[in-house]
C-alpha cells in the first residue's frame, strides 16, 4: 500500500499532526510524510491512499495546498482513497469572538474544501474531513490532539 501524507504548516502544528498520522500508518508499507513544497502532482499517481492536511488560514487551506490540489488533473486521483484534515481553533474559542464565529459559519474550515477538491479529482473519500485543535494562532496543539490524530489514522486504515 503506497501512502502519502501531504501537508503544509505555518507554525509547525499541522506538521506535528501529519507526522502523528504518518507514524500511526507506519506499520503499512511505503508511508511517506511529505511537505507540500516537495510535491509535484505527477508524484500522486499510483498511490493507494493520499491524506492531505493544512492549517486553516482565513477559513481555507494554505495557498500551497490549494495550488497543488488545483494542479492535479481531472480524474488524476481515480482509484486513490483520500482523506483530509486541518488544524483550527476550538468552537469555544471561536465563539468568544462574534465576528469570527459568523465567518466560520459561512466559510468553515480548511478540511472540507480540501476533501471536496480531492473527490473532484477522482479520489474516494474514506472518512469525513477532520479538524485538530490548537490553543492559539501559533499553537500549541491542545493536549491529546496527537493521540487523536493517531486514532484518526487508524480509522483511515480500517477503511482499506
State the predicted function of each range.
Residues 38-43:
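Short acidic active-site motifs
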Residues 2-28:
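N-terminal beta1-alpha1 ligand-phosphate binding loop
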Residues 16, 24-34, 46-160:
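FMN-binding flavodoxin-like domain, especially the glycine-rich phosphate-binding loop
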